[in-house]
A protein has these predicted regions:
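Periplasmic-binding protein-like
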Residues: 88-126, 144-163
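Short amphipathic alpha-helical coupling segments at ligand-binding clamshell hinges
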Residues: 132-143
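A bilobed periplasmic-binding-protein/Venus flytrap-type ligand-binding module shared by bacterial periplasmic
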Residues: 119-133, 152-154
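Extracytoplasmic/periplasmic/luminal assembly and interaction segments
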Residues: 2-65
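Extracellular/periplasmic bilobal clamshell ligand-binding domains
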Residues: 165-178
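Extracytoplasmic "Venus flytrap"/periplasmic binding protein-like
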Residues: 42-99
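Structured segments of extracytoplasmic/periplasmic soluble domains
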Residues: 4-12, 51-55, 69-73, 82, ...
Length: 178
């Protein structure tokens, strides 16, 4: 899966690496407890927190209940800002909103879930708000939905680069030097 993802987003195998960590487990009932008593859930939360602070986590695919936990912590970028109206419109009911933010995309019954045998209940993918590689994370979304040409085409790399340029410089770019 890692090699397919890296190839799918156009990554350079000489300098980039994709790591898929399927060993993390969380008890959704434990997420509602204070303090969290389940040791596996504590370990998984600590691992994810470490990845986030090290800027090593760009997106997460989680069960909806766990995804909600992270949404409540503002862990995910607003996809309306990253993808634009066209992509969000093309995704339609797959856009997952929480607290008025388009924070994820449901993956239930996608070719991606079927091909890789993802067994999560109601899987949702979100781009981590602190990711330093949001363009690659958007590329991941494009790759996941490439079987749906209308959705994949809505992810414009040029529009995304212009948006990032504006975000980093605080000004609108004319698009010529993006």
């Amino acid at each position: 899966m890692e090699e397919a993802i890296l190839a799918g987003i156009g990554g350079d195998t000489n300098v980039e690496e994709v790591v898929v960590d399927t060993a993390l487990t969380m008890d959704t009932a434990a997420l509602g407890q204070t303090p969290i008593a389940d040791a596996n859930t504590q370990d998984s939360l600590a691992t994810i927190t470490t990845y986030v602070y090290a800027h090593e986590l760009d997106f997460m695919i989680l069960e909806k209940d766990v995804f909600d936990y992270y949404c409540n912590l503002n862990a995910f970028a607003d996809l309306r800002e990253l993808l634009g109206a066209g992509a969000c419109e093309a995704l339609g009911a797959r856009i997952y909103e929480k607290n008025g933010v388009a924070c994820g995309i449901t993956l239930t019954d996608t070719a991606f879930v079927k091909q890789y045998g993802i067994t999560l209940l109601d899987p949702v993918i979100g781009i981590v708000s602190g990711s330093e590689r949001k363009e690659q994370a958007v590329g991941m979304l494009r790759w996941i939905f490439e079987e749906n040409v209308g959705v994949a085409a809505a992810f414009s790399a040029e529009e995304y680069k212009a948006m990032i340029s504006q975000e980093e410089t605080g000004r609108k770019d004319d698009g010529k030097n993006v």
